[in-house]
Swiss-Prot record:
Family assignment from sequence similarity: Belongs to the transaldolase family. Type 2 subfamily.
Compartment(s) of residence: Cytoplasm
E.C. number: 2.2.1.2
Coiled coil regions in record: none
Protein name: Transaldolase
Any one GO CC term of the record: cytoplasm
Gene expressing this chain: tal
Active site per UniProt: K142
């Protein structure tokens, strides 16, 4: 089967195409294999909301949940078994992509329990536990970029475990994430780990930034404010890429690179367009640059396949105009630190809520199976 030309062009421009979704249905029907073969998909990301949606639809998980119920498994153990099985199977499906890319792609992400977002020690313990349970080299453990998450990222990288840092909204936090990664690599080197085997991506959220800032611009309501709608998300991500180039062009990283260390690639997340007035491929076509990942919901993936115009690098040379966008936002009264604080709080809360819904639904299923 041939690859879609638009997505092949995106890959050729240095953007790894990952699917922001996973379910047993996708694995069992061959749908994920088809997307790998026809849509240039070379990775998969999951999150609590994705698993909650997967487990609440259809019957694909019923037999396993019933079997776990018969064995007396509690709800946490059940969810851990079910989700790690899916992730392990997806890792195996992407093993060829992992080998072919020397470990850069073919990656599948699984997130630590979102209720641990503000608990460093428990995050570290669960990250190590998930790494051991899934037991695949192409796994990435997702850890949120909260202030408690940062030292956990360093500690987990220091153990030689690959990490996807999630819920990054600001360039300032992105810099702290890159610093945490480098610190982790330095410790891993001291501990004798092979640095070339440690991989990381920094998941920078895009559309949610526009959603929050656009609402505030509409409240201000001036022509100047309204003219800035739909610009912040892309500008923010482009500034993050400039920060990435700076940090990984530094002497500090050069020393680690000499020992085989890899860059921490920026990953554009939250790339489904939420405002119908904007192009549905906006957060893909405007964020093309080498050494990046774009994880897309299937709707966005199909939109790019159908009509996404890939014209090469769309980030190079944009740092000054992107900074100008942020200067204008600040000048008309957008409180940017508050925006990023709200987005982080909402991001953690959203995942906690999905996790709780998943716990409740699974508990209901376990109870029903025991009757």
């Amino acid at each position: 089967m041939a690859q879609n030309p638009n997505l092949a062009a995106l890959s050729a421009a240095g953007v790894s195409v990952w699917l922001d979704d996973l379910s047993r249905d996708r694995l069992q029907t061959g749908n994920l294999t088809e997307l790998i073969n026809t849509r240039s998909v070379v990775g998969v990301t999951t999150n609590p909301s994705i698993f909650q949606a997967a487990l609440s639809k259809g019957t694909a998980y019923d037999a396993q949940v019933n079997e776990l119920a018969a064995r007396g498994a509690d709800v946490d153990a059940t969810i851990r078994t079910v989700t790690t099985d899916d992730v392990r199977n997806a890792c195996d499906l992407l093993a060829k992509e992992y080998e072919a890319s020397d470990g850069v792609d073919g990656r599948v992400s699984i997130e630590v329990d979102p209720r641990l977002a503000h608990d460093t020690d428990k995050t570290i313990l669960q990250a190590i536990e998930l790494w051991k349970i899934v037991d695949r080299p192409n796994l990435l453990i997702k850890i949120p970029a909260t202030m408690a998450g940062l030292p956990a990222i360093s500690a987990v990288i220091a153990e030689g475990i690959s990490v996807n840092v999630t819920l990054i909204f600001s360039v300032e936090r992105h810099r702290l994430v890159m610093d945490a990664y480098l610190e982790g690599l330095e410790k891993a080197k001291e501990a004798g780990h092979d640095l070339s085997k440690i991989h990381s991506v920094a998941s920078f959220f895009v559309s949610r930034v526009d959603t929050e800032i656009d609402a505030r611009l509409e409240k201000i309501g001036s022509d100047e404010a309204l003219a800035l709608r739909g610009k912040a998300g892309v500008a923010n991500a482009r500034l993050a890429y400039a920060a990435y180039e700076e940090v990984f062009g530094s002497d500090r990283f050069a020393k680690l690179k000499a020992d085989g260390a890899r860059v921490q690639r920026p990953l554009w997340a939250s790339t489904g367009v939420k405002n119908p007035e904007y192009s549905d491929t906006l957060y893909v076509t405007e964020l093309v640059a080498p050494n990046t990942v774009n994880t897309m919901p299937e709707k966005t993936l199909e939109a790019v396949a159908d009509h996404g115009e890939i014209t090469g690098n769309t980030i190079a040379g944009t740092a000054a105009s992107s900074q100008e966008t942020f200067d204008k936002l600040a000048a008309i009264g957008i409180d940017l630190p508050d925006v990023f604080r709200v987005l982080e709080d909402e991001g953690v809360e959203k995942f906690e809520k999905s996790w709780q819904e998943l716990l409740d639904a699974t508990q209901g299923q376990l109870d029903a199976a025991k009757k």
